[in-house]
Amino acid sequence: MEASEGIVLGIDIGGSHITLALVNMDTQSIIEHSYYRTYLNSRAKLEPIIDIWANAINNVFAKEQVEYKRIGMAMPGPFDYEAGISYIKDNKKYDALYGQNIKNILAHRLKIDTSQIRMFNDAACFLQGEVFAGAAKNYSKAIGITLGTGLGTAILSNGVARDANLWSSDFKDAKAEDYISSRWFAKRYFELSGINLLDVRALSDIAAESPVARAVFKEFSENLTLFIKQFIEAEQPEVVVLGGNITKAAAWYMPAVSRTLKRYGIDIPVHISDLKENAALLGAASCWQNNSKILAV
């Protein structure tokens, strides 16, 4: 077993799951046998959600002799991360958490002090994880973009990651998330084909044989390129790191993104995260290293 002094529990709260792992802060790595993931109904009432979270946390801590439990949680917003209060609503997930002090409720359920739980924005945790042990490790200024059910954005400056909150920024004739998310893929493919597909993975699976699927990926590459270009021009980073489930289909859009960025004269490296979901876990845990380097915004 690992020595407990350098161990922190990192948690990533997703729209349909909770993923957890103990992190060895000395080696900046996940303790592999501690990794745990379980699915949940984020439309459920408060108590069942907290029950699943608490049971998962206790399950993972039971795998190691950890005398003092420290928890770092990567949470979607809007959320008062310092106080621990959720303001998520009208988003078809976690509405039951709205207005509740989740930090207090969870600490009570776990029988620990609230000071043992730290909560941060999930996109900022992703980028901080990449700084802690990934593609942004040797950079002082970076931007992170998570591509999934929604659009997450974060900025790293002087070693501090913060939520950029660009999902709702003006983009084309709507908001950025309307064009850069798995929801856009489903909507656009249906508009062009009249067929409902479950997710981006399903679209990727048929892209080799489907001109319509390839057309959707081409259009997405144009949207993503424009968004990255605008983000780079605004923040002037040294590196861009992309994560999220949509990056699993990167072969169908990233070559076009890279070519077009070069045509714009942008030669900043754009990396797909090697840490994948582990980035958020590592980033959430890293908030306990020499005080937090993630702004709770």
Which residue stretches match the model-derived regions?
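Glycine-rich phosphate-binding loop and adjoining helix at the ATP-binding site
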Residues: R43, E47-D51, R70-I71, G77-Y139, ...
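Short, hydrophobic alpha-helical segments
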Residues: F61, A285-V297
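Charged, glycine-enriched surface loops/patches
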Residues: R259-I272, L281, K293-L295
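Glycine/GP-enriched mid-protein hinge/lid loop-to-helix segment characteristic of carbohydrate kinases
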Residues: E5-I7, A21-V23, S34-Y35, K45, ...
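Adenine-nucleotide phosphate-binding core of ATP-dependent small-molecule kinases
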Residues: T38-V66, K175, A186-P255, P269-A280
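Conserved phosphate-binding loops in N-terminal lobes of ATP-dependent enzymes
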Residues: A3-E5, L9-M75
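Short beta-strand segments
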Residues: D12, G72-P76, F120, G144-G150
